[in-house]
């Protein structure tokens, strides 16, 4: 299993770098800490930038500071748990349009799984959810976390969504042929007189 970390200061980057992580996560709270972002970028590893509690201008400043190469951007709203009306999932489309060369994903802090599934349908290439053994445990983000059973359902349904999206080309599938033969109706009209 691969793992990576969010570093909250430059010294932590030095420490985590000794473990050769596959990438670094920039926590939403650190998006405006440009020296920290540059320190992570200097490792040469991919960066995942979370965008909670940020303006488009702050996101642009962070991206300008670290460049778009090997950059993943996660739409996020930093409320724990986040009410549905604050999720603003259409930001995924906005980020995809603004940063077409970056991989755009979703970092969810909501209760339930449906918004994360919707994010995938809207084009999120990756998702992040907090995981817990028990949502009733003490802690600021436990209620917005997913228990193990929920994680299994989340992943299985995402795989179903990926298979369901198709390529956008209309076709008749083999499974439709019998129904087509049995149910298809042909409408005809009598020949109209010609003048």
Segments predicted by a language model, with ranges:
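Catalytic cores and adjacent flexible loops of soluble metabolic enzymes
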Residues: 1-194
